[in-house]
Amino acid sequence: QFNEYGHMRF
């Protein structure tokens, strides 16, 4: 899943 920054979120 990607957060509002476009980085991986676990």
Curated annotation (Swiss-Prot):
Residue numbers carrying Pyrrolidone carboxylic acid: Q1
Keyword Nucleotidyltransferase in record: no
Post-translational modification remark: Occurs in two forms, Rhopr-SK-1 contains unmodified Met-8 and Ox-Rhopr-SK-1 has oxidation at Met-8.
Modified residues (Phenylalanine amide): F10
GO terms for biological process, alphabetical: neuropeptide signaling pathway
UniProt keywords, alphabetically: Amidation, Neuropeptide, Oxidation, Pyrrolidone carboxylic acid, Secreted
Modified residues (Methionine sulfoxide): M8
InterPro entries membership: Gastrin/cholecystokinin_CS, Sulfakinin
Transmembrane segments annotated in the record for this chain: none
Subcellular location: Secreted
UniProt keyword Acetylation present: no
GO CC field: extracellular region
Broad class of where this protein is predominantly found: secreted
Top-rank lineage group of the source organism: Eukaryota
Family in the record: Belongs to the gastrin/cholecystokinin family.
Function, in words: Myotropic peptide.
Protein name: Sulfakinin-1
Lineage of the organism: Eukaryota, Metazoa, Ecdysozoa, Arthropoda, Hexapoda
